[in-house]
């Protein structure tokens, strides 16, 4: 009888512990994200600075891939979707091509940048108030279309403008933290 009671208590405590752990990792309030965000953006910028010169030297185009309409989407009601789609775009389309067009020395740096972006995405997804989105962003579609039309040059353009993307992330997050 004592063993059964003890086992029941242990199962109950394990369930409570797991539930609390789940709530703290995936809860809507995410109290640590606003304080850790500047550090994550700093890490993204530092990782980008290691490949910035390489890609900007290869970018021979004068036009901008990431323009003001994308920033407006980030700041507006489509901010969540624009951010989510742009992170996905960089992770699934730009970064793999950037690695393929990099020297062996640059590949590890591009991979590190991608890992930091993945970490940011995971943290934002856990914090539902920062990525609660459903709609599509026309500005992101324009970026993707322009990127595709540029073919190989699109990789250099997108990577050379990664710092602009980080600034847009920061603008979006600043807006969300004020709400």
UniProtKB/Swiss-Prot annotation:
Record's function text: Down-regulates the expression of the TAP1 gene (transporter associated with antigen processing), thereby affecting the transport of peptides into the endoplasmic reticulum and subsequent peptide loading by MHC class I molecules. In consequence, infected cells are masked for immune recognition by cytotoxic T-lymphocytes.
Give UniProt keywords alphabetically.
Cytokine, Disulfide bond, Evasion of host immunity by viral interleukin-like protein, Glycoprotein, Host-virus interaction, Secreted, Signal, Viral immunoevasion
Q: What is its main location?
A: secreted
- Protein name per its UniProtKB record: Viral interleukin-10 homolog
| Region forming the signal peptide | 1-18
Per the record, GO CC terms?
extracellular space
MF terms (GO), sorted A to Z = cytokine activity
Q: Which family does it belong to?
A: Belongs to the IL-10 family.
PROSITE patterns found in the cross-reference section: INTERLEUKIN_10
Q: What is the lineage of its organism?
A: Viruses, Duplodnaviria, Heunggongvirae, Peploviricota, Herviviricetes
Instruction: Give me the glycosylation sites of this protein.
Output: 100, 135
Q: Which Pfam families match?
A: IL10
Lineage top rank: taxon: Viruses
Q: List the disulfide bonds.
A: 30-127, 80-133
Where located? Answer: Secreted
Transferase listed as a keyword: no
Entry-linked InterPro entries: 4_helix_cytokine-like_core (IPR009079), IL-10 (IPR000098), IL-10/19/20/24/26 (IPR020443), IL-10_CS (IPR020423)
Q: Name one GO biological process term.
A: immune response
């Amino acid at each position: 009888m004592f063993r059964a009671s003890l086992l029941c208590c242990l199962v109950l405590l394990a369930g409570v512990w797991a539930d609390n752990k789940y709530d703290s990792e995936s809860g809507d309030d995410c109290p640590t994200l606003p304080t850790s965000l500047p550090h994550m953006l700093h890490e993204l910028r530092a990782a980008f600075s290691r490949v910035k010169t390489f890609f900007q030297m290869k970018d021979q185009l004068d036009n901008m891939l990431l323009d003001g309409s994308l920033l407006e989407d980030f700041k507006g009601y489509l901010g969540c979707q624009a951010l989510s789609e742009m992170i996905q775009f960089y992770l699934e389309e730009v970064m793999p091509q950037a690695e393929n067009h990099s020297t062996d020395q640059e590949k590890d740096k591009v991979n590190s940048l991608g890992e930091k972006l993945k970490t940011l995405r995971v943290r934002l997804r856990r914090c539902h108030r920062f990525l609660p989105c459903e709609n599509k962003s026309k500005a992101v579609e324009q970026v993707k279309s322009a990127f595709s039309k540029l073919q190989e040059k699109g990789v250099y353009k997108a990577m050379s403008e990664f710092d602009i993307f980080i600034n847009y992330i920061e603008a979006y997050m600043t807006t969300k933290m004020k709400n």
